[in-house]
């Protein structure tokens, strides 16, 4: 039970009725959030990471919805506890695998938000830049890509762009590009 987040009463959005009270599942009822404040959960996640790196031989990880790891009351994203957890996580796998690579999906992240993760993840996807690329390719204003690129150059470490066009939570590029 302590591996998940529970409440005896219904705190509201994101909480779902279970057999033993209400459990927290930010995205939907079929995906309850793990309780990353529980040291057992953290230890098991570290074991999982080591398994994939040591036994399977992967080169790194893509972390979905990275900003939604640990909630603090009504604050559901980018909490200090989330950043603290990632700092420790980063140290765990980088110690034995310094070349392992992690990229985080931090929806809405541009250059400024990405700065807050530089000591926690190798990169975060730059959503502002992606939106600018798509809008410019569709013949819309180039000001979006210009400002996103300028902010990226100003706020990101050199070469830390983590560019993409769209992802699994968005319409795919073939359906968003006009014409070609």
Question: What would you call each of these model-derived segments?
Answer:
Residues 1-180:
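Active-site and adjacent substrate-binding regions of carbohydrate-active enzymes
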């Amino acid at each position: 039970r302590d591996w998940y987040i529970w409440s005896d009463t219904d705190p509201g959005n994101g909480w779902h009725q279970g057999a033993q009270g209400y459990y927290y599942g930010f995205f939907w009822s079929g995906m309850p959030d793990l309780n990353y404040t529980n040291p057992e959960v953290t230890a098991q996640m570290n074991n999982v990471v080591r398994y994939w790196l040591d036994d399977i031989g992967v080169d790194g990880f893509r972390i979905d919805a990275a900003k939604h790891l640990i909630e603090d009351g009504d604050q559901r994203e980018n909490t200090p506890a989330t950043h603290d957890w990632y700092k420790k996580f980063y140290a765990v796998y980088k110690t034995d695998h310094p070349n392992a690579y992690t990229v985080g999906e931090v929806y809405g992240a541009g250059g400024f938000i990405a700065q807050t993760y530089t000591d926690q993840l190798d990169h975060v996807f730059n959503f502002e830049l992606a939106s600018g690329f798509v809008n410019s390719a569709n013949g819309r204003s180039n000001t979006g890509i210009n400002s996103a690129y300028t902010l990226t150059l100003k706020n990101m470490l050199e070469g830390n762009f983590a560019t993409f066009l769209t992802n699994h939570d968005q319409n795919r590029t073939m359906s968003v590009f006009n014409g070609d």
